[in-house]
Regions:
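Core catalytic region of metal-dependent phosphoesterases/phosphodiesterases
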Residues: 1-20
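Acidic, His/Gly-enriched loop-helix segments that form or flank divalent-metal centers
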Residues: 14-116, 121-144
Length: 144
């Protein structure tokens, strides 16, 4: 497994690098400044994109210029030209893993009561386990 930088990691990096530190971020402040700061070097090293043979993975998708966008929710796949091969993304929860052309959307809302999903580009296999949340608030979520 590869840990990719996503919008929450970037938000924490930005908070730790700002003059205000964690004081303006109640969620991150729970970590405690010294505890959070020890993670900063690792967070800064997280890749935005992981590239495999004929595929890549990124947290949320790509903007119109083909740059990784950590918080995009627009259907970027509608204009995707295939330049990166198959693209595996998360970020936007869906009731099930979806394949939209060369795009594979794997966020199945574990935090909202859905499954935690993993995808293998080499075999097209999907593995799912029950998420920790017990109340399925994501529309259409069923058992894994």
């Amino acid at each position: 497994a590869t840990w990719l930088r996503g919008n929450h990691e970037q938000d924490l990096i930005d908070a730790l690098e700002s003059q205000d530190g964690l004081s303006q971020h109640a969620t991150y402040a729970q970590l405690g400044d010294s505890s959070a700061r020890q993670w900063l070097p690792r967070l800064q090293q997280l890749p935005l994109v992981y590239r495999g043979d004929g595929w890549c993975a990124t947290h949320a998708g790509f903007d119109a210029a083909g740059q990784p966008d950590l918080s995009i929710r627009d259907p970027f796949w509608e204009a995707y030209d295939g330049r990166f091969g198959q693209v595996v993304v998360g970020h936007t929860p869906r009731p099930q893993v979806e394949r939209l052309g060369a795009i594979v959307l794997i966020d199945t809302g574990a935090v909202y009561g859905g499954c935690l999903s993993a995808y293998c580009p080499q075999t097209d296999a999907v593995v799912q386990v029950e998420g920790a949340a017990t109340d399925a608030v994501l529309a259409g979520v069923g058992p894994c």
